[in-house]
Design a protein with these regions (language model features):
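Bacterial N-terminal signal peptides that target proteins for export
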Residues: 1-12
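Bacterial N-terminal signal peptides
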Residues: 11-21
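Carbohydrate-active catalytic/glycan-binding domains of CAZyme proteins
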Residues: 23-332
């Protein structure tokens, strides 16, 4: 059975590679087809950029596998194939809803290891849960832990989805963040495949409206000049108003102070750009040059299943002298 699954994955991966051997165009979107919830990684091992995402275009957010694309210049993207399939024996605890992944590259001894976190639908039923798979390569193959690492909400409501991983350059400690309807964070153990349960902290930004910063989902954390930046998405992923807001903290587990001007990225109807959110952030290594990677609704599906027809985009993100984030102008 294992051989059959591997053959299936290899065949499917080859099909993707043949269909999208390389994708390049001026402007956005940067990937072919429908993808959402993008996570970007720069690999110190390969000196390439990688994007991981929810495979979109399926009714009811029913995608069941993850693919990965690589690039050396953020413009030309190569399909590396399927790296995790939730409907195969590769992931014994889940059977679908492969959503919103994140990944961390860690130097373990003298070898780079890759820890891939994601949410899936458990075979036992109930709400979504979060799992982890590992690899020696950013493109895989990945081996799942065999069971979820986050199964329940610390608030008693919401979903265990939209996981983010962050390693604090100040301390070397790594953290997970997750939650729809709430934001939770916890320190990871050194093994990167389990959390320190005693550190679980509910840190949902309070207040706001759907027009500014009312928290919905998709936490993302990064560090710059002594501050921890927390980003999140507002409203529903199928809404043109879906957008990104942020706050800051002096600690990786909060509390979070909402920014005076919290909206980072929002729709631009004049350019037919709708629902730009659920982002990750890239700092170009060795520079203070930053990019925001996000999805938006494909304009042709604005009135027909917009929440499952999304496309991945990249734009520059800049800071004011006081460290606040300038509002990003989304581009086509």
């Amino acid at each position: 059975m294992i051989v059959t699954i591997k053959q299936t994955l290899i065949a499917f991966g080859l099909l993707l590679a043949v269909t999208f051997p390389a994708f390049a165009q001026s402007g956005n979107p940067v990937l072919p087809g429908f993808h959402a919830d993008p996570e970007i990684l720069y690999s110190n091992k390969t000196k390439k950029y990688y994007i991981y995402s929810t495979t979109d275009g399926q009714p009811g957010w029913g995608g069941w596998y993850f693919t990965v694309f690589s690039s050396v210049d953020l413009k030309n993207w190569k399909a590396e194939g399927v790296m995790l399939d939730l409907k195969s024996d590769q992931v014994p605890w889940a059977d679908g809803n492969a959503w919103a992944p994140c990944i961390e590259e860690k130097l373990v001894g003298d070898q780079y290891k890759y820890f891939f976190y994601y949410s899936g639908n458990p075979k036992t039923g109930g709400g979504k849960q979060i799992g982890v798979a590992t690899s020696d390569s950013p493109a895989g193959p990945f081996v799942d832990l065999g069971h979820p690492i986050i199964t329940d909400s610390p608030t008693g409501h919401g979903q265990q989805i939209d996981v983010d991983v962050f390693t604090d350059s100040a301390s070397g400690k790594s953290y997970l963040y997750w939650g729809n309807g709430y934001m939770a964070g916890a320190e990871l153990n050194d093994d990167m495949i389990s959390i320190k349960k005693e550190t679980i902290t509910v840190m949902t930004p309070e207040g706001g409206t759907l027009q500014d910063y009312a928290y919905r989902e998709a936490a993302y954390v990064f560090y710059r000049n002594g501050l921890y930046y927390f980003m999140w998405s507002v409203d529903d992923t199928g809404s043109p108003n879906y957008h990104v807001a942020y706050g800051t903290s002096t600690s990786p587990l909060g509390p979070i102070k909402v920014a005076k001007t919290p909206v980072v990225l929002i729709q631009n109807p004049e350019k037919e750009i709708y629902g730009p959110a659920h982002n990750s952030i890239l700092q170009v290594p060795g520079t203070d040059k930053w990019y925001i990677v996000y999805h938006r609704i494909n304009k042709n599906y604005l009135k027909s299943d917009p929440g499952v027809h999304r496309e991945v985009c990249i734009d520059r993100m800049e800071f004011n002298e006081d460290g606040s984030i300038k509002q990003v102008i989304p581009t086509r």
